[in-house]
Curated annotation (Swiss-Prot):
InterPro entries: PAPS_reduct_dom (IPR002500), Rossmann-like_a/b/a_fold (IPR014729), SO4_adenylTrfase_ssu (IPR011784), Sulfate_adenylyltrnsfr_sub2 (IPR050128). This is Sulfate adenylyltransferase subunit 2. Pfam families: PAPS_reduct. With CysN forms the ATP sulfurylase (ATPS) that catalyzes the adenylation of sulfate producing adenosine 5'-phosphosulfate (APS) and diphosphate, the first enzymatic step in sulfur assimilation pathway. APS synthesis involves the formation of a high-energy phosphoric-sulfuric acid anhydride bond driven by GTP hydrolysis by CysN coupled to ATP hydrolysis by CysD. The gene is cysD. The keyword Nucleotide-binding applies. It catalyses: sulfate + ATP + H(+) = adenosine 5'-phosphosulfate + diphosphate.
Length: 302
């Protein structure tokens, strides 16, 4: 079967598998960043296909903040156990000792210390020279201009004005000692592509993506699910039960839910076809500062 006979999703799958294999062939110590979300689940599925029947030739890394949804932790541990993945979990020890959290310290400081600095510490600790991430270009404007091979200096910083050309699926992976790259095999996928692929490949995902009655509060126009007793209720806030789901997942105090009746994959796909808003509108960390995502990426965020 030649390329012209492949379906749209098959072409995307083939491109992603090519990128995964190319990185493993080029780099000495790659790792896959596993955030437990739908994109991570698709990327992990593609990696299993790329190297089947062998085990994955790299570990998974989850940079934990201590504030993920409980269902995410359960799904992470179940997945690692079921497939026998080498899962490394890292949490910024200084941030944990100081009790950094989104309620007291705010989303910007929480993200910088527990996510960005935590990721940089983990990459340095294990000496990884390439890190797969599940980011897509359609998610956010700073990601739209980022290459598939995203080069980082010795401090893990990204310079959007210093990117290498990527012509005809040729990727230049030459780096100096101490430098690294972030690799995005799903760059050319859209949110709809992800959901259609999950449906066609029957990929297991966190149940939070499906609509269900959940305890939520409304804060600054965003529905926040109350996942545990660490919630810091403000005056006038009342916990109510609403049927909601999540289009994107992160730390639960910083992730907005959407009202939805979509409790099956076909219903989610139908919802995506008529949606006019970005999936990351519910990620409060994307709007906590001016040019927030690009600033975070320049500092070392994935």
């Amino acid at each position: 079967m030649n390329e012209t006979q492949l379906t749209h999703l098959q072409q995307l799958e083939a491109e992603s598998i090519y990128i995964l294999r190319e990185v493993v062939a080029e780099f000495e110590n790659p790792v896959m960043l596993y955030s437990i979300g739908k994109d991570s689940s698709v990327m992990l599925h593609l990696a299993r296909k790329a190297f089947y029947p062998a085990k994955l030739p790299f570990p998974l890394l989850h940079v934990d903040t201590g504030w993920k949804f409980r269902e995410m932790y359960e799904f992470r541990d179940k997945t690692a156990k079921e497939y026998g993945f080498d899962l490394k979990v890292y949490r910024n020890p200084q941030g944990a000792q100081l009790g950094i959290n989104p309620f007291i310290h705010g989303s910007a400081k929480h993200t910088d210390i527990m996510k960005t600095e935590g990721l940089k510490q983990a990459l340095d600790k294990y000496g990884f020279d390439a890190a797969f991430g599940g980011a897509r270009r359609d998610e956010e404007k700073s990601r739209a201009k980022e290459r598939i091979y995203s080069f980082r200096d010795r401090s893990h910083r990204w310079d959007p004005k210093n990117q290498r050309p990527e012509l005809w699926q040729n990727y230049n992976g030459q780096i100096n000692k101490g430098e690294s790259i972030r690799v995005f095999p799903l760059s050319n996928w859209t949110e709809l592509d992800i959901w259609q692929y999950i449906y066609l490949e029957n990929i297991d995902i966190v149940p939070l993506y499906f609509a269900k009655h959940r305890p939520v509060i409304e804060r600054d126009g965003t529905l926040i699910m109350v996942d545990d007793d660490r919630i810091d209720l403000k005056a006038g806030e009342v916990i109510t039960q609403q049927k909601v789901r999540f289009r994107t997942l992160g730390c639960w105090p910083l992730t907005g839910a959407i009202p939805s009746q979509a409790d099956t994959l076909p219903a989610i796909i139908e919802e995506m076809l008529i949606s006019t808003s970005s999936e990351r509108q519910g990620r409060l960390i994307d709007s906590d500062q001016s040019a927030s995502m690009e600033l975070k990426k320049r500092q070392g965020y994935f």
